[in-house]
Structures are given as C-alpha cells and as structure tokens.
C-alpha cells in the first residue's frame, strides 16, 4: 500500500479532483491534512473521509510544511508520496512507479502541466544516491521538489523545516536523498502540476528574503555533501529565481543591495 499525503488549505474548488485522481491509483490510503482552512474545505475533508481509504487530520494553520509533517507522522505504509490539493496524479502513476522502482529507496516520475501529456518511451535509470544528488543540485527546479516522487517510508525520518516558506520541499528532499543508497528516475508520466494563481502574492523583497532563508537552511547539508560544483549551481539557480521576482522594488534599493551582498557571501561559503 502507498500513503498519499495531501496538505490542504482553502482548496474547496480543487480538492475533490485531486482526491479522485488519488483514489484511482489502486491500493492507496489518502491522508488529508487540513491546515486550518476557513472556506468550508474542512467540512469537505470530513465528508470525503467517509470513504474507507481516506483519513483526515485537522490542525491549526501552521503552513504547508507543518501539514506535510503531520502527514509523515501519520503515514504507515511502505511507500508514500505527496500530492498538492490543486494538482492531480496521472492515471496509473503509482502502479507504474512501484513496478519500476525495484530495490531503489526512491523513484521520480515525470511532472507535466497537461492532464493528457504525450506518452514517453517507458524507461528507468537507477543511480547511486550521490549521482542523483549531483544531478538534483544542478537542476533543482526539475528534481528538488515533492512532485512525482515515490519514497519508501523508511527514508522519510527527516521533517520539513516549518520556518521556511519558499523552496522548503527542495531543502527537505536534499536531506532525504542524502540518506538513500540508490534512486530511480522513470520516464513515466506521474504528476500534473497546475500553476498557482496565488504564486505571486509575495512581494519581490519577501521572495528574496525567503529564498535566502532557504539557502541558509540548506547550507549544512551542502557542506556535508561536499559537492562544491553542484552546490554552486544550486545556489545560482536560487539566485536566478530571486532575480526573476526582482531584487529591487521601488523604494527598496538599499534593502536589495544588502540582500545581494548576503547572497554573495553565501556563494563564497
């Protein structure tokens, strides 16, 4: 059996579709973690939990990392995966990944923005964890997130850093992959990611500040891995993400310069 952890916050319009896609995966248990929703989502979670394969956890609003941690605490199956409440798992995703995983402790499927993507030639590549980490650090937006990953519960002893607001899933995945022996990558459509309408609610200054906090939190893991070239690319990718949102806002030039200085110091370390 596979536990599917769905952190939920004010997802009244999308949750049922996400849950339906999860139930279609076969032998799964769905853990809905309601993070203090205020729009009727909590009541919907209770209604959905009448299904024998759905359980619900209600908690006060502490953010997506706290919700994922509550799901990890409740997980009991050999394997687990995460699904955001406004995304969907593609048909047969879990079954295909389980079949291809073999003895690997984690396997990553393909993430798409289409619910009817082209079907790739089904292949799987098994890598030592260090090789996977090198690849992930060089391409964090492709690999360092929870989307499309199927993980053995035994490697998920780490918890999400609840103080982080952006890039927190990538920082967690780094720590999880650090504890693996082999990881598989599968050319299998697994996860459909929907662009968030609220993904730009942060001001540019907040985005820079939060990504900088994530880089600082990731520093001990990067030091432990001792992969300087890959780590430099990881930091540079975060710098590009910050620049995409704009480092300097009107009236915030000095603050932007200070934060750029902090980024440069991190890169030198």
Segments and roles (model prediction):
Residues 20-29:
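Short, acidic, metal-binding catalytic loop of nucleotide-sugar glycosyltransferases
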Residues 21, 34-43, 62:
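A conserved acidic beta->alpha catalytic loop
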Residues 132-206:
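Conserved nucleotide-sugar donor-binding catalytic segment
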Residues 92-121:
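Conserved donor NDP-sugar-binding/catalytic core segment of glycosyltransferases
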Residues 185, 190-269:
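C-terminal subregions of glycosyltransferases and related glycan-biosynthesis enzymes
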Residues 80:
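Short aromatic/hydrophobic "clamp" motif used to bind/position activated sugar donors
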Residues 59-75:
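Glycine-rich, basic loop-to-helix element that forms the pyrophosphate-binding segment
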Residues 13-17, 39-47, 88, 92-94:
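Acidic helix N-cap motif at the loop->helix transition within catalytic regions
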């Amino acid at each position: 059996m596979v536990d599917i952890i769905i952190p939920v916050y004010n997802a009244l319009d999308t949750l049922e579709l996400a849950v339906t896609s999860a139930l279609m995966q076969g032998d799964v248990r769905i853990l809905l973690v309601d993070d203090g929703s205020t729009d009727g989502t909590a009541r919907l979670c209770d209604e959905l939990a009448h299904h024998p394969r759905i359980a619900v956890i209600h908690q006060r609003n502490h953010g997506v990392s706290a919700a994922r941690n509550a799901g990890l605490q409740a997980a009991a199956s050999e394997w687990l995966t995460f699904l955001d409440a406004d995304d969907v798992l593609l048909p047969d995703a879990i079954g295909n990944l389980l079949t291809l995983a073999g003895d690997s402790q984690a396997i990553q499927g393909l993430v798409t923005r289409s619910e009817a993507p082209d079907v790739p030639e089904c292949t799987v590549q098994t890598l030592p964890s260090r090789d996977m980490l090198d690849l992930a650090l060089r391409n964090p937006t492709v690999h360092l997130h929870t989307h499309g990953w199927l993980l053995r519960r035994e490697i998920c002893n780490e918890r999400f850093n609840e103080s982080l607001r952006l890039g927190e899933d990538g920082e967690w995945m780094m720590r999880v992959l650090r504890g693996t022996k082999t990881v598989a990558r599968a050319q299998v459509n697994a996860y459909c990611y929907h662009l968030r309408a609220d993904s730009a609610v942060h001001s540019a200054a907040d985005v820079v500040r939060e990504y900088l906090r994530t880089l600082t939190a990731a520093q001990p893991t990067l030091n432990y891995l001792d992969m300087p070239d890959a780590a430099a690319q990881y930091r540079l990718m975060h710098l590009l993400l910050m620049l995409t949102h704009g480092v300097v806002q009107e009236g915030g030039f000095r603050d932007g310069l200070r934060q750029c200085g902090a980024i440069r110091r991190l890169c030198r370390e």
